Amino acid sequence: MKELMVRENYNLDETIAKDLFEGVTYPWEVLPKIGTFIKELGAELDPEEYEKRGEDVWVAKSAKVFESAYIHGPAIIGKNAEVRHCAFIRGNAIVGEGAVVGNSTELKNVVLFNKVQVPHYNYVGDSVLGYKAHMGAGSITSNVKSDKTLVKVHAPKGDIETGLKKFGAMLGDEV
């Protein structure tokens, strides 16, 4: 299942969350760990570069967050990122450097690597989006199966049990 592994699909130098991926094989393995990781990393961020805006919310001073955007922690908004009009960040969200979270886009339990774009009316939940990944307008990473059972990844050499009830999308770099 090499084609699904973190090291095959993601440049970990393109995320502030590099340490989150230590010791994992598949990208979905980080999903249950995002919130705790943000709280630990946020406490260590340089106050010259990041400001704390509420409970467990850190925003780079160079980031642009529109007044109508809502950010619920834990969350880290990276340098030069944009969180645009009416964006809704529900928590457990890492928004990478230079990333764009657009108009009416909703994020929950995600890692967006640097320069990711989710610019228009997107829902991204329980997902990892690699460096320069882009989701078109209205894209949704529906994250719960209709029968509410645990998600399996169907791979060429057989199914992989994720142990997760919620699972959105794993987009590699430049997808």
Task: Please state what every model-predicted region is.
Residues 42, 69-77, 82-172:
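Flexible, glycine/small-residue-enriched loop-and-beta-strand segment within the central core
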Residues 1-56, 61:
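Terminal amphipathic alpha-helical/low-complexity segments used for targeting or macromolecular assembly
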Residues 62, 66-68:
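WD40 beta-propeller repeat fold
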